[in-house]
Regions:
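Extended hydrophobic-aromatic, low-complexity segments
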Residues: 27, 45-50, 83-84, 116
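Amphipathic alpha-helical
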Residues: 1-6
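Short loop/turn segments at secondary-structure transitions that flank enzyme active sites
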Residues: 20, 24, 43, 112, ...
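A short, polar/acidic, helix/strand-boundary loop motif
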Residues: 37-70
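Glycine-rich, flexible loop segments associated with nucleotide phosphate handling
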Residues: 9-15, 48, 96-105
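RNase H-like nuclease module associated with reverse transcription
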Residues: 58-179
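Short glycine-rich loop/turn motifs
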Residues: 12-13, 30-37
Length: 179
């Protein structure tokens, strides 16, 4: 694993890949979430992978979209925390009433989740509506720049949630510091 200089804070953002697998734990009803966080220079596109996590989702998810939604919500929460902490480190200022942060850009490979976030229709699964509304609100408040859809082949967190996921792409990112 190598790290590269990313330059000034004005050109930095956190990029997060969130993924989930439904009903893949030993009990066959619990799901797994995974996330990979990168610091990215928005001009040079150079990245440093600095955090990854895989864990059991605490609530039972009926569908894959539910697991993906909860994984995205948890990943965004962690990303905003790091984005604010990085801004505090670089600026030397802490403002708890109006916290500043670097940009956060997210990625999911679940097309139906992405569609729910980018249209005005309500989600069919009523228990997910609050989570989807929260993510939409974070985008409106500019806590999250965008939620992008990526193909599963380009999902860095895929290897953290599935036994057959390929780790070649994430290995390449770690070695070359490029997406």
């Amino acid at each position: 694993m190598t790290f590269t200089r990313l330059g000034s804070i004005q050109n930095m953002r956190i990029k997060i890949h969130c993924d989930a697998s439904s009903n893949n734990q030993e009990d066959k009803i619990s799901s797994t979430e995974g996330r990979v966080l990168l610091m990215e220079n928005t001009e040079s596109r150079k990245v440093n992978l600095f955090c990854w996590k895989a864990k059991k989702i605490t609530s039972i998810c009926r569908l894959v979209r539910g697991a993906e939604t909860r994984a995205l919500e948890n990943g965004i929460d962690e990303s905003i925390y790091f984005a604010r902490m990085i801004h505090e480190i670089y600026s030397g200022k802490v403002d708890l009433k109006n916290p500043k942060q670097i940009q956060v850009k997210t990625a999911t490979d679940n097309k139906s989740l992405w569609e729910n976030l980018n249209n005005s229709r309500q989600c069919d699964e009523k228990l997910l509506r609050n989570s989807i509304a929260l993510v939409k609100e974070m985008v409106e408040r500019c806590e999250v720049e965008t939620v992008d859809w990526v193909e599963t082949l380009n999902m860095l967190a895929d290897t953290l949630t599935k036994s057959g996921g390929s780790a070649l792409w994430i290995k390449s990112v770690m070695e070359q510091n490029e997406l």
